[in-house]
């Protein structure tokens, strides 16, 4: 049986943000199992031969930023904003169809673009395509809009219900922790699978020993002092208190 052509879609696959890193890990495992992975986003640092760059899919695209400025922090939106949303949705939908046909995509993996409403036109375009084509889709959710205060007051509740995430039969939803699983079930009646973010301890990154020693020295640490890192924002849902309890449990002054 031939491997699948798998299309990853998001606003950005570049740099070291969590979504980009996790997508890379997934694609590595999928390719090891005989599949081919292709990429659609507004910013890409992937293999150009397997990439479909569309700058208007980026959350920082100027028109999208203007749309966001008009819909968050207020309870209604103007007609001109709705028109702008649908103009961009229509454009992105056409580009997504081109991506599907160009690379003969068998399966979509949508990384957070159906989760956090940073690019609402992209989420709407994806939802319509999935509904129209019934293409098998994995919606990989990293953080939902209700987890961020900036989205709590908005003028797009209709779009949030429609596409963030959409409740469609062809979509399998994946979340990164059990709390998200409980919330998506409670709020939306959607079942999901938990796949935590992972680290490949068998293949650690290459370490520059000189930089490590210099870093330790700058902090006044000895060579054998332990460093405990919590590489997240300081917000409630990151559970920083658990890291504090872990350090306490080490009993290492």
Where are these regions (language model features)?
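Catalytic cores of nucleotide-sugar-dependent glycosyltransferases that transfer UDP/GDP/TDP-activated
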Residues: 1-253
């Amino acid at each position: 049986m031939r491997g699948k052509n798998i299309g990853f879609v998001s606003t950005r696959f570049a740099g070291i943000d969590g979504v980009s890193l996790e997508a890379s890990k997934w694609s590595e495992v999928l390719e090891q199992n005989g599949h081919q992975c292709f990429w659609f986003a507004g910013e890409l640092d992937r293999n150009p031969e397997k990439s479909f760059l569309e700058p208007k899919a980026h959350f920082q695209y100027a028109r999208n930023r203007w749309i966001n400025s008009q819909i968050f922090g207020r309870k209604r939106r103007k007609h001109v904003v709705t028109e702008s949303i649908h103009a961009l949705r229509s454009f992105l939908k056409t580009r997504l169809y081109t991506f599907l046909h160009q690379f003969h995509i068998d399966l979509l993996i949508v990384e957070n673009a159906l989760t956090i409403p940073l690019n609402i036109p992209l989420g709407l375009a994806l939802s319509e395509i999935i509904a129209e084509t019934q293409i098998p889709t994995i919606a990989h959710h990293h953080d939902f809009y209700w987890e961020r205060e900036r989205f709590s007051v908005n003028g797009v509740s209709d779009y949030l219900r429609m596409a963030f995430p959409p409740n469609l039969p062809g979509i399998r939803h994946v979340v990164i922790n059990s709390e998200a699983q409980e919330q998506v079930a409670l709020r939306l009646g959607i079942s999901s699978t938990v796949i935590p973010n992972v680290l490949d301890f068998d293949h650690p990154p290459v370490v520059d020993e000189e930089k490590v020693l210099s870093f330790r020295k700058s902090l006044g640490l000895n060579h054998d002092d332990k460093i405990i890192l919590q590489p997240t924002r300081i917000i409630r849902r990151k559970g920083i208190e658990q890291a504090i309890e872990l350090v306490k449990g080490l009993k290492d002054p």
